[in-house]
Curated annotation (Swiss-Prot):
Example of a GO cellular component annotation carried by this entry: cytosol
Family named by the database record: Belongs to the pantothenate synthetase family.
Catalytic residues, chain numbering: H36
PANTHER family: CYTIDYLATE KINASE/PANTOATE-BETA-ALANINE LIGASE, PANTOATE--BETA-ALANINE LIGASE
Gene3D superfamilies: HUPs, Pantoate-beta-alanine ligase, C-terminal domain
Primary localization class, coarse: cytoplasm
Record protein name field: Pantothenate synthetase
E.C. number: 6.3.2.1
Catalysed reactions, as listed in the record: (R)-pantoate + beta-alanine + ATP = (R)-pantothenate + AMP + diphosphate + H(+)
Amino acid sequence: MLVKEIKLLRNIIKDWRKHGYSIGLVTTMGFLHEGHQSLIKKAVKENDKVVVSVFVNPTQFGPNEDFNSYPRDIDKDFKYCMDSGATVVFNPSPEEMYLKGNCTTINVSGLTDFLCGAKRPVHFGGVCLVVSKFLNIVTPDKAYFGEKDAQQLAVIKRMVKDLNIDTEIIGCPIIRENDGLAKSSRNTYLSEEERKSALILNKSLSLAKEELVKGNLNPENIKELITAKINSEHLAKIDYVEIVDSETLQPVKQIEHSILVAIAVFIGKTRLIDNFTFELNI
């Protein structure tokens, strides 16, 4: 079922609650791929009803970013969601989601000071606002987010905790192409040559992981190795290479417990992100 109005969706949710159904939510910006499908299928497995939102959120894009060019295909997305087991696809307009004169913002300080938050200053304010709206409208028991957007996942978990929102936030593993490239809607921007060059993200992270497993626990040294590997690809331009505490997302000077190794790289004009977590077993 395709729903575009908040009021109608809320009426559907009320009816589900009357019957005691559990509800799962997957929020997306559309142009769905196997990464999204893995979230939907997990939600379907764990809940009686599943809502998938398909909404390119204008408030999380900064000036000169790709809001207008972001790929959209609601007909294809709707079929993809239904084939994956979703109950409802919620596809509101920006006017439906944001009242004229909207002046409410949500800022999760600290967690957004580094990584993508530092490079895209308006991004997480927009993410938090729209996700809080979806959680308020759908009131899901569980909501599912991909670990590829590791900072987003951490920020949303913190927001939900701080605002006492009664939804369990569940992180789901990164889904990759056979050659290791993390699935992303933005991969469609890549030319054939750029697509090959994009493999440098996973290659550089694999190198870092090997070094960590060997016992190289110097974060600056690991960052240097990643940087050198990425710079060996002429189409790649580094946005950031960071090693941070996996919970606080603060940069670490030494590796003592769980860390997140995260990178953002421009391949041509396309900005791609990737990461992995590493747990030090003492």
